Amino acid sequence: MQNLKNTTKEQKEILSNAESILYTCKNDLGNFIESEVIKSNGKYYRLQATNKHITEFTEV
């Protein structure tokens, strides 16, 4: 995912070093819901964003 809004400094650092493992995107009545699993510094993270606004950012 690129150009995400409302990211923290820590999230930006994780995203800058991340490798995408799985990415999906769906259009739900005009809302673009993106989901992605990334790997950064040996840790895995699950992200979800709606219209480029992060709704979930968790380590798995």
Feature-to-residue mapping (PLM):
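Mixed-charge, Lys/Arg-rich low-complexity intrinsically disordered regions
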Residues: Q2-K12
